[in-house]
Structures are given as structure tokens and as C-alpha cells.
Amino acid sequence: MKLIKGILFSFFVFSLSSASWARQALTYDIYRLAVQSESRLERDIKRDETRHPREVLAFFEVEQGQRVLDLFSGGGYYSELLSYVVGGKGEVIAHNNQAYLPFAKEDLDERSYAVRLPNVTPLLSEANDLELAADSFDRIFYILGFHDIYYRDETWPEIDDNKLVANLFRSLKPGGIVAIIDHDAVVGAGKETAQEFHRLSSEHVINKMTQAGFVLNDSADLLKNEADPLTISVFDKAIRGKTSRYMLKFIKPLAN
């Protein structure tokens, strides 16, 4: 009898493990299908080599049916990938402000959300004017833009960092994830690197996010580039498109 119980227990554990593995494999396959979609733009595919989108989507646990905010989405590289993953029952809000549009125009014209990606809703708003419903997003992607909070220029409206991050916290569902990727700077460097190099040390992001109530759940070195000196502009020809970038996964704690 003990032998039979042992066999049954082992089979039960094996079945659970197999089911868990199968779910993980199926989920990861969703990311592969998104990246390999024949509908993707050629300009996006050329960027994949240094961006590793399949691994990024997996790291931030994007799933079917989710509602995702792509904050300062630019030309929409991630908005399109997210739209494939969340599917018809999900939605992607592709946000930009007015200053982004001239730089993203060529990409956005070809992206043609209304025709190609009906589950993507463009949102044009300055950061300080964002109106986001409470607990309305499962994921928030903030890719290569956090440093712009501390950038100052006559063509770039000043951003209230506390107001923006508090807005993100309020609009994210409990248990939801904020995905942040940005150009790294030298450890200990001040926020002035955002102005000078369009970079920001991860410590500033972590401090600002945790002060607002987020919890840093994980980080990854997937996009790290040891050849990046971290002390030149991200637009320098020597490093453009190949900067060393950090990946930070923040979670909004579940309500008590």
C-alpha cells in the first residue's frame, strides 16, 4: 500500500511539474510568435538584435488579455509587440507627448495603428496632464524614457516627477508590473547626466519608484554592454543603438 501511495504521489508531483512546464513553454511561445510575426515592420526587426524583445516580454510577464500602458511609446516598437501578445481581449495604450511626434512621425506613419493594430489606442498627452483611471493597467512599459523626466529644454515640457510616478502607482492594478529600461550612467552620477548624455543611473529610478510605493521585484543584465563607457551621449555614433541598459521590474503591492 505504501508503495502504491508513493507511486501515486510521485505521479501527482510529476503531473503538476509537467503542467507548470507546459504553461511556461506555451507562454514563452507567445513571445516567440510575436517577435516572428510576418506583420512586423522591417525597421523593427533590424532593432531586435540589440533589444532582445522576446526575453524582455518574458521578463516583464506580459500575458494575453492584459491592458498595458506604453508610456512615451515613441515610434511604437514595443506597442506593436505588446499588441500581439495581449491579443484581441487585451489593449495597449500607446502614449506620446507632442514633443515626441516629430521624431516618431516616420515610424508612426508606417505603424498605422488604426489599420494594422486595432487593439492599440494612441494617447497624446503631456506627462503632467495624464488622466489615468485608478487600477486600470496590468502592465506599464516605460522604455528608454525615465531619464527624460529630468531633461530640460524649451521644446520639452518640464515634468513633475512626483506627480507622474504617483499617477503610475494609482493607475496600476495591485500586483501589476512597471517595466523600466533605460540608458545606464556611471554609478553615483547625479541626475544631470539626463541633460548631458540622455542617461540616468538606475539608483535614481529605484529611489523614485520605491518612494512612491513600488517594490523592486527583479532586475536583469540582459541589455548590459561592457563596451559602453557610460560617459558619452546615447546619440554618439560610437554607441547609438548599443548603449548599456538596465532592466528593472517594479510591482505594486497587493492591497492589505
Language model regions located:
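Class I SAM-dependent methyltransferase Rossmann-like catalytic core
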Residues: 30-59, 63
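Short glycine-dipeptide loop
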Residues: 65, 88-90, 172-178
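Conserved class I S-adenosyl-L-methionine
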Residues: 65-74
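Glycine-rich SAM-binding Motif I of class I
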Residues: 76-80
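A short glycine-rich, Lys/Arg-flanked "PGG" loop and its adjoining helix->strand segment in the class I
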Residues: 83-84, 155-174
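A short acidic, Gly/Pro-enriched loop at the edge of an enzyme's catalytic core
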Residues: 130-140, 144
